[in-house]
UniProtKB/Swiss-Prot annotation:
Originating gene: lmuB
Record flagged with keyword Hydrolase: yes
Function, in words: Component of antiviral defense system Lamassu type I, composed of LmuA and LmuB. Expression of Lamassu type I in B.subtilis (strain BEST7003) confers resistance to phages phi3T, SpBeta and SPR. May be an ATPase.
Keywords: Antiviral defense, Hydrolase
This protein's name: Lamassu protein LmuB
InterPro entries attached to this UniProt entry: P-loop_NTPase
GO MF terms, alphabetically ordered: hydrolase activity
BP GO terms, sorted: defense response to virus
Disruption phenotype: When this gene is missing the Lamassu type I system does not confer resistance to SpBeta in B.subtilis.
């Protein structure tokens, strides 16, 4: 992404302004502080979708329209924001924050998902999370921990900002979780198929046994009995097929019911264990009577040792047990009804000795057809089992491959992180290659993807914050799955000496400014510390940020059809 231009319209005070930017380094310059630099930068990233925690006291965004022109993958878009309503140039209707966040992720070709604090379920991340790694706020980014408590929007997510950076660096485990969920589903489906095959084979064996006792019909007057044979054969065959189906359904449902009851029993034991907090309590399998530890039950049921999770699954299984029990009752009733009809046909056949031969013929033929149908069903289930096993093999290979790729990538990034810690220490401590005492600035308190509170005070603390931000900007430049223009508001929060300022600006110029677009606020007095200052685009902010004579011209940009 590249920011081309930015417009502000204050419709209450009838003031406006427009700013144009370049693709490289953009310096927001003023002669002193409180001249509007922060208002400009905060408003720009607010328009992009970052919910800024606080604006300057004299900057009331409730009476302002903001519009930013950006280039994403060589396509230009206009993004307009007023409070929590967004308009984008390629969508006709206004968007809320959630809809805009989805639009932004789609344009950046990413899929960032974060876990909700309460439900632990994954949701598509809001735009504030997408922008967070690239924006350093003047007021909220320089205290506590890096990238923490910068916006209230992110309080809904767990493990922030670590999970955001894992997603940005393609280190997130959520891809693995999706594959593992698919693997679990396929494995469960395979187990169901295996159970179905077993049930079918049992029914088939019963039919073969029954069919062996049926006498073979050798002589039948087909011409005389043709109509009766066709009629009774069709009736008998249809009813027997229905009986087979209901037997199969009953066997499958009973198998599922038994499994659900077993899982319910184990869950009840787990809940008791969880409440009593026993470390190792055995429970007994209701079928094989083997002892199951709490961990084995948790593993078999694919659960973590969480009381609420176990309780929720127990409720779901109890509902499933009731549902299966009711279905079995219905199927038994329907089967009994059909069997009554078959008995009625048998009674009619037996009433006439002339139809005895037909009765034997119908029974033998119907049982043969039922046996063939069962064999066909077994073949289909065996094929389904084979296909599922192949899918499981493929998924396991993908999971193992992805695990290795992520582990390897993390090792590479961690090595770069360690190297950057050493390099930036040298710059900020003003050390040469022969002086190896790096004790002046301690950057060893945070490992890669650790975002704990940073110790220290005064300029020492400022230097630590700056160093860690520069480390992550360097890593973003090299490993991020997407790029948003870098932004760093003023980092000088305390008195600073000339030499210290020189080293800090040297580090910024080396590790923050680069070929990608960046925005940096600076007072004109400190421009002398930048070696390549003449090559940077400067936006001078003096006096009032907004002016009346630009209002009518810029207001035309905010005319919407809808």
């Amino acid at each position: 992404m590249i920011i081309i231009a930015f417009s502000i319209l204050d419709f209450k005070n009838k003031e406006a302004q427009n700013f144009d930017f370049k693709a490289g380094t953009n310096l927001i310059v003023s002669k002193g502080n409180t001249k509007g630099k922060s208002s400009l930068l905060k408003s720009m990233y607010y328009t992009l979708g970052f919910d800024v925690h606080q604006f300057p006291s004299n900057w009331n965004i409730n009476f302002m329209y903001f519009q930013i022109e950006v280039l994403i993958n060589n396509v230009k878009y206009n993004i307009t924001r007023q409070k929590n309503i967004f308009r984008v140039s390629d969508v006709e209707v206004p968007l809320n924050v959630k809809e805009y966040s989805e639009w932004l992720q789609h344009k950046l070709e990413i899929k960032m998902q974060l876990a909700n604090t309460h439900t632990k379920h994954l949701y598509e991340a809001y735009s504030s999370a997408v922008i967070l790694p690239f924006y350093i706020d003047q007021d909220d980014s320089w205290d506590g921990g890096i990238y923490r408590n910068v916006t209230n929007t992110l309080n809904q997510y767990t493990r922030i900002p670590a999970d955001i950076f894992k997603s940005v660096f393609n280190l997130s485990n959520y891809e693995l979780l999706e594959l593992q969920n698919s693997l679990t589903n396929y494995s469960k489906e395979k187990n169901t198929v295996v159970s179905t095959i077993k049930s079918l084979l049992n029914v088939l064996e019963d039919y073969r046994h029954e069919n062996a006792d049926v006498p073979t019909v050798s002589k039948i007057d087909k011409i005389a009995l043709n109509k009766d044979i066709d009629r009774y054969l069709q009736m008998q065959n249809e009813l027997n097929e229905q009986i087979v189906k209901y037997k199969m359904k009953l066997l499958n449902k009973q198998e599922m019911l038994d499994l659900q009851k077993q899982e319910l029993s184990e869950l009840e034991q787990l809940l008791k264990m969880n409440k009593k907090r026993y470390n190792s309590i055995e429970t007994e399998c209701q079928y094989c009577h083997s002892k199951l530890t709490k961990e084995q039950s948790l593993t078999r049921l694919d659960l973590s040792n969480n009381y609420f999770e176990i309780s929720l699954l127990k409720e779901e299984i109890e509902k499933e047990v009731v549902k299966l029990t009711n279905e079995i009752i219905i199927f038994e009733s329907q089967q009994n009804s059909i069997e009554s009809k078959i008995d009625e046909i048998h009674r009619r056949i037996q009433n006439s000795k002339d139809l005895l031969t037909i009765d034997d013929y119908v029974k033998a033929t119907a049982k043969k057809e039922a046996s063939n149908e069962l064999e066909s069903l077994v073949d289909k289930q065996v094929l389904s089992k084979y296909n599922l096993e192949e899918k499981i093999k493929v998924l396991r290979r993908e999971i193992n491959k992805l695990k290795k790729e992520k582990e390897s990538l993390r090792e590479i990034i961690e090595r770069d992180y360690t190297d950057l810690v050493f390099e930036i220490k040298k710059v900020l401590n003003d050390l040469n290659d022969t002086k190896l005492d790096l004790s002046e600035l301690n950057l060893d308190e945070l490992k890669f993807l650790e975002f704990k509170k940073i110790s220290g005070s005064g300029m020492d603390k400022n230097k630590k914050f700056l160093a860690y931000y520069l480390i992550y900007f360097s890593l973003l430049r090299k490993y991020s799955s997407y790029i948003i223009p870098f932004c760093m508001d003023s980092f000088i929060k305390n008195e600073i000496t000339g030499e210290t300022a020189k080293k800090m600006f040297e580090a910024i110029e080396k590790y923050f400014f680069d070929t990608n677009q960046s925005f940096f606020s600076i007072v004109s007095e400190n421009l002398k510390h930048l070696e390549f200052v003449d090559s940077y685009n400067k936006i001078n902010v003096e006096g009032k940020l907004l002016v009346r004579d630009k209002y009518d011209e810029i207001a035309l940009k905010f005319k919407f059809d809808s």
